[in-house]
C-alpha cells in the first residue's frame, strides 16, 4: 500500500478531516501522506447551529427497544453530515478508506449520539465504506501505530483525547482494550464527579466552554479565548478535579490487573490547548499526579488510526 491507496476520515461534531497515509508493513506503522483537508458542516446551507440532540435517556431507551424515532430536525442535521462526508470522499475516491465516528453504533450507523443527530442508516449513504470505526479506538490506534503518535512504545498507559467529548483509551500490556467489552472500565461520560457533572462535561474543551458560557451569559467559541478570563482559573480547577477522578478510576483498574500506568497522553483539542497556550495549567495537572503526562497536539492521529485500522482489518 502507499499514499495513493490509503486514507482515513475522522468525523467530529463540527467537521470532517481527511488524511491520506503511507503504510509500511515492515514496521506496521503509518505516516501522514500528502492529502489533508477539513470539511466543516457549517459550510452547508442547511446546517443548524442551534441543533439540540435528543436527550440521552430517550436515545438509549429507543435503541434498546429497537424503536428509534428520528425527529425532523435530526433527519435534516444528519443529512448535512452525510452530504459533507460524501463530499470529503470525492478527494480520496481512489483510496482504501477507513472512517471513524463518535457515538454508539450498530452495523448500519449511529444509534446513540451525545453531541449531534443520530444517523442509524449512515452506511447506506456512504457506499464505499462497509463499517464505521469508533473514534476513541482510532485516536489511540493513531497514537500507537502512526509515526507521529505519542504512544508508539507504551506498554501500559491511558489516553485522554479532549474535543466535543472525551475519547478514552487504555493500553494494557501493549494491547488496546475494547472499553465497550471490558468490565470495570467506565468511560468519561459514565464517571460522575458530582450529581450533575461527569468527567466528560468538566474536562472536554466543549464542556469547559459550555460551563463558562452558561455561567457568564457568554458566547465564547474556543478554549484559547478563555485563558485570560478571571473565571477560567476556577473552571480549570474543576477540570483538574475531573482529570484526577478519571486517573483514580483508571489506576484502580490497572491495579486489578497487577499493572501500573506508565504514562498519560492528553490529545486532540485538549492536547493542542495545553501545547499552545496552557503550559501553566499543564504544570498543575502534572504536579497533581506522579504519572508522567505527555501531550499529543497533532490532530491527524485519529484519521491515521482509521486508515491503518482499515489496512490491518
Where are these regions (language model features)?
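Short glycine-aspartate micro-motif
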Residues: 6-10, 96-98, 156-161, 265
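Adenine-nucleotide phosphate-binding core of ATP-dependent small-molecule kinases
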Residues: 62-95, 201, 209-274, 292-302
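Glycine/GP-enriched mid-protein hinge/lid loop-to-helix segment characteristic of carbohydrate kinases
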Residues: 5, 16-59, 131-133, 146-234
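Short glycine-rich anion-binding loops that position phosphate/pyrophosphate groups of nucleotides
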Residues: 14, 102-105, 163-165, 270-271
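Short active-site-adjacent structural elements
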Residues: 167-169, 272-278, 303
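Glycine-rich phosphate-binding loop and adjoining helix at the ATP-binding site
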Residues: 45-156, 273-293
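Glycine/Thr-rich phosphate-binding loops that ligate phosphate moieties of nucleotide
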Residues: 8, 14-16, 20, 25-28, ...
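Conserved glycine-rich phosphate/nucleotide-binding loop
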Residues: 2, 286-313
